[in-house]
């Protein structure tokens, strides 16, 4: 995931000042741009010198061949005149005046200079890339410039009644319908581990079927992705911070051969966006085939580092969940990807409108965007039991930022194009099932149970097509109030004092 290097090169029409400004708007280090420009300038100088040295080496070989053909004496003198050691000014005429033995010596020295130059070039290329991969995509003009998403995310529109309040939160409701085992899940899988069971399994499957059917009717191809990716491929679709904060690493045998003891490093996917992004890696996509639209379906795995203490109960923020994802490869021309961006968020909105979930759409501030996103809109549903908006959907246009690293090019072949172009890539959540279940539970709760949204009823089993009944009391109703806790603790303290007094009296009687 990187920007076009030509954007940093003034002689190629680039504007480093524009990228520096983008970094500042993202509240990231603009000095990375200057470091990259310096490393790139030195790299280009080094490559130019290496090209000239290779030409000189070929000239040496050609001159030796001509002299051998003429049967000129090889000579034994390997001393090199001072002016010949200046390779930048060395010409064919200068070489022709030397003996074969001297030219061979010159070729050997040129070889050493090439190796030294190549070593320097590799070092500069690595330095340049380290800076390049930490510089974010160019921002869309409509992105709010701020580093405080809590205060400055811009609300674009609201749908439904986002003021209504209801009694229970999703944390209680998953227990009341007997669809969740949290304590046992944590014993088996660790923190945030859970078992989804009974009615909520049916509700989850109903959401998956409905989401896939909706996307299928809009020209999306359903695709079930691998759950893990090779390290070298994951590096092309994920930014560096994700490896520490989000991704799980798995290590296994590198081969199915019993005598092979090598081990392979892979990463569990955090979203189906990652493997789908790599699906057309190293390909040329024809203009007439675009847009290519995928409805990704996968289990997702996230470490949630940095979320300590947030949403620790229930199923809203968990390490493992199912998700349906919109993913699109688009033309880079005629504003096509931005038209697709609007279409994808509209598709998500219509999905949640059909489920009757109130929401608002927020334009995410520049400081909270990941490197790849040029712009991101979130759909945040209203949770009437929690009294808060919670994120269900993220929709991003990454323009050509991801495609460049994955080498997914636009057009026929390089020979038929004046300049290599890259497709634009977009992604948007359709339905993260556990979060959507939480939103349904809070919005559709009644005194007797959860009313099943009309669009999901055909996917539910008999007896659960209209109402999911409450079968357990709410945990919050089982917890004593602060006043009750205080009274209980006071009674226990008083009882202890009485017991101690009785013991002292008994001791006095015994002694008497």
UniProtKB/Swiss-Prot annotation:
- One Gene Ontology cellular component annotation? cytoplasm
Instruction: Report residues binding ATP.
Output: 302-304, 318-321, 391-394
According to its UniProt record, where is this protein located?
Cytoplasm; Nucleus
Pathway in which the depicted protein is active: Aminoacyl-tRNA biosynthesis; selenocysteinyl-tRNA(Sec) biosynthesis; L-seryl-tRNA(Sec) from L-serine and tRNA(Sec): step 1/1
**Its GO biological process terms?**
cytoplasmic translation; negative regulation of angiogenesis; negative regulation of transcription by RNA polymerase II; negative regulation of vascular endothelial growth factor production; selenocysteine incorporation; seryl-tRNA aminoacylation; tRNA modification
Q: What is known of its domains?
A: Consists of two distinct domains, a catalytic core and a N-terminal extension that is involved in tRNA binding.
Protein's UniProt name = Serine--tRNA ligase, cytoplasmic
Which organism's genome codes for this protein? Answer: Rattus norvegicus (Rat)
């Amino acid at each position: 995931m990187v920007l076009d290097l030509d954007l940093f090169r003034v002689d190629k029409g680039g504007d480093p000042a524009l990228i520096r400004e983008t970094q500042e708007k993202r509240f990231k280090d603009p000095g990375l741009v200057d470091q990259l420009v310096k490393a790139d300038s030195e790299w280009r100088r080094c490559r130019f010198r290496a090209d000239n040295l290779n030409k000189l080496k070929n000239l040496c070989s050609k001159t030796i061949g001509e002299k051998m053909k003429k049967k000129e004496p090889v000579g034994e003198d390997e001393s090199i005149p001072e002016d010949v050691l200046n390779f930048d000014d060395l010409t064919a005429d200068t070489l022709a005046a030397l003996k074969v033995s001297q030219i061979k010596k010159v070729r050997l020295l040129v070889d050493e200079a090439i190796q030294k130059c190549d070593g320097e070039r590799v070092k500069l290329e690595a330095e340049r890339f380290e800076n390049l991969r930490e510089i974010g995509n160019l921002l869309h003009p409509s992105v709010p410039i701020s580093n405080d998403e809590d205060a400055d995310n811009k609300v674009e529109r609201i749908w439904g009644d986002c003021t209504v309040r209801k009694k229970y939160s999703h944390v209680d409701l998953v227990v009341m319908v007997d669809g969740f085992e949290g304590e046992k899940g944590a014993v088996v899988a660790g923190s945030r581990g859970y078992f989804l069971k009974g009615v909520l399994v049916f509700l989850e499957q109903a959401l998956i079927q409905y989401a896939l059917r909706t996307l299928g009717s809009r020209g999306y191809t359903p695709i079930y992705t691998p759950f893990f990716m090779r390290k070298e491929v994951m590096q092309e679709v994920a930014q560096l911070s994700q490896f520490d904060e989000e991704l799980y690493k798995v290590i296994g045998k590198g081969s199915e051969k019993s005598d092979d003891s090598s081990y392979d490093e892979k990463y569990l996917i955090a979203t189906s966006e990652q493997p789908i992004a790599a699906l057309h890696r190293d390909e040329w996509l024809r203009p007439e085939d675009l847009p290519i639209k995928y409805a990704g379906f996968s289990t997702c795995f996230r470490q949630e580092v940095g979320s300590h203490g947030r949403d620790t109960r229930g199923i809203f923020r968990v390490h493992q969940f199912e998700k349906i994802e919109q993913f699109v490869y688009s033309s880079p021309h005629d504003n096509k990807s931005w038209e697709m961006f609007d279409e994808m968020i509209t598709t998500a909105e219509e999905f949640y409108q059909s489920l009757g979930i109130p929401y608002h759409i927020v334009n995410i501030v520049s400081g909270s965007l990941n490197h790849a996103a040029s712009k991101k809109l979130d759909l945040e549903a209203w949770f009437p039991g929690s009294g808060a908006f919670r994120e269900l959907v993220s929709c991003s246009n990454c323009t050509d930022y991801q495609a460049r690293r994955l080498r997914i090019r636009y057009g026929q072949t390089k020979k038929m194009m004046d300049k290599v172009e890259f497709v634009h890539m977009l992604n948007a959540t359709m339905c993260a099932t556990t979060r959507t279940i939480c939103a349904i539970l809070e919005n559709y709760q009644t005194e007797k149970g959860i009313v099943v949204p009309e669009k999901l009823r055909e996917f539910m089993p008999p007896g659960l097509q209209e109402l999911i009944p409450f079968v357990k009391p709410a945990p919050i109703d089982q917890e004593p109030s602060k006043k009750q806790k205080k009274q209980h603790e006071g009674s226990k303290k008083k009882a202890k004092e009485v017991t101690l007094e009785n013991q002292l009296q008994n001791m006095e009687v015994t002694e008497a």
